[in-house]
Structures are given as structure tokens and as C-alpha cells.
Amino acid sequence: TVILKNGDELDGKTLWSDPTLDLAVVKVNAVNLPAAKLGNSEKLTVGETAIAVGTPLGLQFQHTVTSGIISALNRTVQIPTERGENFMEDLIQTDASINPGNSGGPLVNLKGEIVGINTVKVVSAEGIGFAIPIDVAKPIINHFIKQGKFTTPYIGVVGFDRQIASYYKQNKDIMAGVYVVNIDPKGPAYLAGIRIDDIITMVGDQPVN
């Protein structure tokens, strides 16, 4: 059920979801609905104002608005998923309050433009929350508008780049590419011959960096 600001309730249908990206597309059959403008997360700067909207801790606190700043950009966070441990990358870090239930709500700038989608917070600390940049969601949205569906690419590896490998004290001198730390034994990469400890430097003729 999708509940609008005026209290109207609409039936929602989940067209697509991906727990790894922590994103979903929900469709409602209605017309003339107001829509928020999508901003450009590439233009964000550290220190600018960020406003988070959501429903923390249940419906009794729906439409809660909190504010803060953009604390950092391009953060990487390790989270558990149904596929095992996953690394969410390129996240926006903010000190605007994000609590359970805020996930999926918008992070907006002072123009009211959506620049991110709230996702997770560090439970052991206050003032450290994260949002998915809206530019990550835009291709998915556009694909749905044009084709009515979206298939999540999946190769079945967990990889560290040079910076993350160094952070986790992996003794690998990686100058380029991605170091494979885990692999799905039923996934495409394994079937193609990729193994743990490999370094992927090219996919076809496309460099991996």
C-alpha cells in the first residue's frame, strides 16, 4: 500500500527490487500525481545542506523531516544481504538523521530536488547516515520508462579495488583492476574460470578500474 500525503491509499505493485543495491521500483495506477524533481548528485559538494524525509520507526512518525549537511562523498559501506556480505559503493554520507524506516525516502537539497535515496546508518554512532546517489537510480528509472523492465547485471564476484584491499590489509600489490575476494560457485564468473585471488583487469576490451 502506498500512502499519499493527503491520506489517500493506493495499491502498489513491486516491479523490481535488488537487495544488493537496496533499491526497488513500485508502480501505482493513478494519474495527475505530484512528482518531485530529480537533481544531480554529481554536483553535490561536501558541506552543503541535506534534508532527509522518511517514516522512521513506523507510520506514527510518517513524513518526518530532518536536516544536516553532506558530510562526505563516494563512501563504501559493508552490509549483509541475502547473497552474503556486500559492499555498497559511491554512497553519500550525511549527518541528517536516518533511522529504521527512513530507507527509501528522499535526500533533497535546498532546491527541493532529490539528490539521493536514504539507505543505511552506522548503528554504533550518531550522525553517520548514507544515501544512494540519485544518479545511480536514474538509469534504472529511464530503463523502466522505455522498456517496462530492468534486469540487474550479475557476475557473481565480490571484489576489492586497490583502496579497499589496502584498507582491509590484503597483501596484494594491485596497480589496476579488481581483486576477487569471494565468488559465487554457480555464477557466471566462476563458470568462465575466475577464481578467488584473481585480479580482473579487463572485461572484453573494457579496462576495469
Features from the language model and the residues they span:
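Serine-dependent protease modules
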Residues: 1-169, 174-176, 181-185
